[in-house]
Each structure stands twice: as structure tokens, then as C-alpha cells.
Amino acid sequence: SGISGTVFFWYAAVCMALPVIRSRNARNYIAIAALFVFGLTHAVFHLYLQPFQAGALLNGLLAGLVMVAGFIGLVGMRIMPFFTSKRLNIAQVASPMWVALSALVLPMLMAVLMMFQTALPLAGLLGIAAGLINLVQVFRWWHKDVVREPMLWVLFAGYFFTALGLLVTG
């Protein structure tokens, strides 16, 4: 399952890359890289299974979870302000490009450092930074009427706890 799972992620990266590159959709280039790194975390996790290095295995597992948090950050940065503005009929809160990229890039770098067990203090700082940036975004997007809309408050709760998870992991 280790090889097939890794191949799946890398094949998904290739399948996504073809139309994204063809259409020159630069905004989604980072998602292609993230799928590749997701496959890499999957492969390294399975490499640690064979000699059963428990500490390394845990780092590999956490690196994969950090990548999931990065994907949640990427998707959340795109949909939460949009859904909030449309559902509540308010102006959409814009996010600077560096903030939107940080939601995925910081966890992605953190995951790479964790899975190779190198520069772990830097990985921790990246997690703290990603968590704080995402928490700031939750408060920037917040509107008091979110609590009356189940679809919105579930999104906000999920994003909030994902940010806390990155903060605590860091």
C-alpha cells in the first residue's frame, strides 16, 4: 500500500499539473507542489515502517497531518471569505497573497522538516507562525451573524481548530 499510495499522490499531482500549467493558472502551482510533498510524506512514513523507528514514524505521521492542515488552510483561505460574504450579504474580506500562500507553504515546509527530522526548532516556528496567521484570518473574516448560519460556523470552527492544531504542534 505504501507504493500505491505514493504513486496515487504523485499521479494526482501530474494530473492536476497538466491543465493548471496549460492554462497558466499560477495561483494553483503551489497546490501541485503540495500534492507532491503529500506523496513524499506518505513514502517517508512507509520507509520508517520497515525498521520500525517509532519516533521517526510518529514524525512521519505528524508530517502527513500537518500537510492536511496545510490543505485545509489553502481551501479555507479561498472559500471562507467568499462563503461568508455571499451568505451574509456583506463585503468579502480580501487577504494579501502572502497570507493566502502562507496557509499552505508554512505547513508544507514544516512537514518536510518534520519528516526528515531536521531543523525541528525551525519546523516548530513555522507551525507557530502558520497557526497564528490562520487565527488572525479567522478573526478578520468573523462576523457576528456567522453563529446563525450552521454552514459558516462549522467552517469557522474547523479552521479555528486547525489553526490551533498547527500552533500546538509547533
Language-model region placement:
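Hydrophobic alpha-helical transmembrane segments of multi-pass integral membrane proteins
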Residues: S1-G170
